Structures are given as structure tokens and as C-alpha cells.
Amino acid sequence: MRRSKLSSILVTGTLASLLALTACGGNDNGGADNNNGANNGGDNNEDVADNGDNNAEDNGEEAAGEDGLYSIDDFDNVTSNEGEAIDGGSITFGLVSDTAFEGTLNYNFYSGNPDVQVIQWFDEPLLTWDENYVYTNDGAATYETSEDGSVFTFTIRDNVNWHDGEPVTAEDWLFAHEVIGHPDYDGPRYGADFTNIEGMEEYHNGEADTISGIEVIDEKTLEITYLNVSPSLVTGSVWTYPLAKHIFGDMEVADMSSSDAVRQNPIGFGPFEVDSIVPGESVVFTKNEDYWRGEPNLDEVVLRVVNPSTVVQELQSGGVDLVSSFPVDQFPENAEMSNVEWLGIVDRAYTYIGFKLGHWDAEAGENVSDPDMKMADVELRKAMWHAVDNTTVGERFYNGLRWNGTTLIPPSHPEFHDETNEGREYDPELANQILDEAGYEDVTGDGFRETPDGEELVINFASMTGGDIAEPLARYYVQSWEQIGLNVDLQMLEFNTFYDLVEEDDEGIDIYQGAWGVGIDVDPTGLWGRTAPFNYTRYTNEENDRLLAEGVSEDAFDLDYRAEVYNEWQEFMVEEIPAFPTLYRANLVPVNNRVLNYAIGDGHGVYLNELAVTAEEAESAE
């Protein structure tokens, strides 16, 4: 991608001053939002393992190149420690966040990434998937399909039980669908994956008392009939999270997400069970001796929230054994930390700038675009993308461990990410030209452009707090837009407040900086579709509808055809720009040298019940 002269000198100006503010490290801007299904991404789950030697090279750290940049290709995703495990033991997991976790601790109701970092320890999907994101028969349930692919028959293993000893049943699996499809459901899950089930829309609209396409065959067997057969059905579109009917069955659906069964006494069938909760701060888990994969090696896991500003000290002292993620801007100065092994993967996530283009119609269950919105002019959106230099941001803020985003399908899905699509290059001169030609002129002489109608233009920009880098990075974007004559007013908000306001289409937000965790299935419908609650831009377009539908059509079983469709969709979104990606990202996780059998990413076959330690106490850094 061509870089203008301004890109090369930026470090001596605005960006250099921001770097000076962050020289002591810090975190990026908070967590990632989630998409329309827990197994469809957004949670960035970590299931990891460890190396052993204290030598930096042997501990998974790769030296930076001569340019001071690191590459995610130099990291492994499974620990390599070969020490002997002790009996039992306890580990401490740090949930890295500058805010409390919200506490909606059930896959059927949660919406924020911090909550899923808690849930993953005590609950899990009934189906697992391989490194290509295809469902396997190695999980708590197995599946078969009819010859035409429209009917799935699921069988839950006999030894899969809730933590209270009750069996996980087909009725529980059906019940989850009934709750999510209910008109009073207040969570974010209901969307295209559910409306594709035969009879779901009739049930949701109150025209039927049952979902005709879901049948309980026996206690452990469930059959679901889907309306449209697509490759997504085996890569993420099946809802694989049951809901314990013996606990929730007598509750009103509208009361479930705020109930003690979600907030104080959550239940699952995973390797650990919840022993105690300090709301928003910490959770103590004890092992589930009857876990279906086998009794866990560890006796206990302690999860506590760790501020990004103190995560290094916690790791060095052995206060935590491993963390949800590590602020990559702090990696260079800690790459040789002697008591940890560094794991890394290309994250299924990206940061982005979103433009508010409409509102959510709750009654109709769809997004509605509004041509009168402040950011409705695509020429204004084009100029704002051209005005920011994310290549330099990735290099200078993150030493290459975040890099310029080009399309809305990240490289975590290499078979569908279009490497030939360069997005929109950094070119402030072109940005100025676009605004000039579109009629945005400085009428009043105050240095800021007015609208083509001569009215004042103030763009309200919301971004998340989250450590030392969050605000300077957001201010870099503001200053970049000011350099092309746009008056942008920045508001920094903590994670929960930020998403409350963005979800509610608050009138005080015109643009926002968010982060998406994408699904195991590449299908972007859950993030950018007409009926997707998580489509926070509220963008709709018939061509967008068509391309998203083509991507999950029967023709899309041909992977080459599907890739072609998604290449076309990526290019379409580069032209339409309801949002633009800013950075793709590496996910780095340091793991204490005493930890055995931990892995991050997908399809590695290492599970949390295998997690073990070689010593009673965590190793401290030298």
C-alpha cells in the first residue's frame, strides 16, 4: 500500500507526542464487542499451555526485527512445559480490564466480552469445532445430518450433567431456543441463525405455541429442521448452549437475565463450577469432579479482574498465572520476562470506526437506515478513512502486533480475507479533495468545515477507556480529522457505559471506535445484517442483503464461490463504509512457567480439565 510523505514524518508530529504520553506502557481501548452467538465469536476464549526454560528465545519470545517490529508468526499457541504435575493445586486467572465485568453469566444472555471470560470456566458449548471452524463429534454432543442437509439430529452424551447433578437434556436444548425466540427475551442472540429454524418466526410472532422445526426425540436426542441449507450450519450457525429448564422453567422470560441463577448462582456443565462471586471483581471456581471429559487436574481456579496498568507487576510477582489477554503495546519491554512463556495467535477480532446511520426498530426486529443522519453522506465517511494512518499506528503504538485493517473480514479467516483488497489508503490530500468536491467548506473561517448546506458540523466521537493508550489513540484520530477541517468532539466512556449508549443509538454519538470479535463462521450477517442487533451502525442496503444471503446459500458450499462472494462483499463495504477497520490484532497471552496443558485459539484439542501445575506457588520473575 502506498504511503504518503506525511505518513513518514507523522512520528515527529502528532503521533510522536502521543507516544511520549504512553512511553510507560498501558492498554489499548478495552474489550471487544460480541456478535450474535457465543460460539460465533466475540468472546476470544483462551484455553492455553507452557514452555519451561527461562531463556527468552526458548520461552516463546521472538526478537524484534531491525525495525523494532514483531510478527505474530513467531509465536506458538500451545505451551511446551514438560514438568511433572502435582496433585490438585490452584491457579489465578487475570481478567484484564479497566472495568468490572457486568455479571450476566450465561451464554444465552450475555453481551460483553468480560462476562464470557468468566463463563468459559464453568460452561461450554455442546459441540466443538476443529482448526477450520467445522463442527466435530468430539464434544459433549454429536450430530448427524439428513441427506439434503436440512435436518440435524443431535445426541447429548449420557455422562453430560449440570453441576447440580441433573442431566443435560434435549429438553434443555429446546428450552434455550424457546427462550431466545420468545418475544420477551431481552438478550442479543435472536437473529438470522434462529429465524432459519422451521417455525421459529411463527413462534416468535405469537402465531404458534411451539417451534415446529425442533423435536425432542428422547431425553438425550434433539432434531432441528432448518429452512435454508448453507455451509454456516456446520461452522457456527447452530445454537449449542442449553438452558437448564429445571432452574429457569418457572421464571418469566423477561426476568431471567437479571435473576440470581444468572447473576449470583450460575450453573453450567463445564470443568469447574462457581463457588463464590464478588460481583464485577472476582470468582472462585472449584473442580467439577463429574465433568464429562474427566475429573480436572486442578482443585481450584481463582479469577479476578486485573487493571491493564498493573498486569505486568501481577505477572512478574506470580500474582496471576495467566491472563485473558496482554496489552500488546507493553510486550516489547516485557518480552524477556523470565517466569512466563508467551503464546500468540491472530485474533478473531478487529478494531473499527463505526458511523451511526439509523436506529434499531425493536418492534420490527430490524435496523432502519435514516438518510438524514449526520454521517449519511458516504463522501464524508470516505474522507475520514483516508485521513488516518493505521499502518503507522500499528507500528508505533503496537510494534507490529497490530496492523492496518483493510476489510471487515479479518485475516483470522485466511480463506475468506481478501489480501488483494487494500481498503482505503492513508491520503489526507485526497481526503481534503473529497470534502471540497462534496461541498464541505469552511464558511465561517474558524478552521472547520460546515455542511454542504452551510450549517455547523460537529461530529460526536465516542471511544472506550482502557489504559494509557486508549485516550491518546482516540485523540490521534480526532487530530487527524481536524487536519482535514473536521470538528470532532471526543467522549471517553468506560466499557459498559459505552456499549449501553451505542446499543441505545444515543443521539450524542455520531461515530464510535469499537472492536468486534468475529465468529468461527465467517458469515458477517450477525454483525452487519439487516436484522442483526449487533449492527450498531444500523446500516441497511439491499445489495448488502443480497451478498450476505449469497454467502450462506447452497451455492456457497463451493468454497471458491463463497470466497468470491465475500471478496465482493468486502469491496462493497469499502465503497459504502458504514464502518472501516482500523487495526487487525495479535492476541498475546503470557503463561507462568509452572502451568501445564494450556492453549489458545481453536481446534488445538487441549481442554481446561487438563490444566495442571508443577508447583504449589507461581514462579516469580528474576
Each predicted region: which residue ranges?
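C-terminal motif of bacterial Sec signal peptides marking the signal peptidase cleavage site
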Residues: 20-23
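Short, low-complexity, disordered segments immediately C-terminal to signal peptides
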Residues: 25-70
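Long beta-strand-rich cores associated with HINT superfamily self-processing modules
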Residues: 591-622
